[in-house]
Amino acid sequence: MLDQKLLSLLVCPVTKAPLIYDEPKQELVCVASGLAYPIRDGIPVMLEGEARVLSQEEKESYK
């Protein structure tokens, strides 16, 4: 589980938009950029090159 205080401070490094915590997938999702940043060993990896591109269906599911 990601600390809620930490989550409130983090934003997408590309768009500066807020992130959505997807606990089952262990990702931080940015709908604005269409990217999902992995969480590895409890640490968010906030690098654009490490992010996964969301499908259109995934983007819609987070709205």
UniProtKB/Swiss-Prot annotation:
Pfam families: Trm112p (PF03966)
The organism's place on the tree of life at top rank: Bacteria
InterPro entries noted in UniProt: Trm112-like
Signal peptide location: none
A GO-annotated cellular component: cytosol
Family: Belongs to the UPF0434 family.
PANTHER family in the record: PROTEIN PREY, MITOCHONDRIAL, ZGC:162634
Protein name per its UniProtKB record: UPF0434 protein Sde_1297
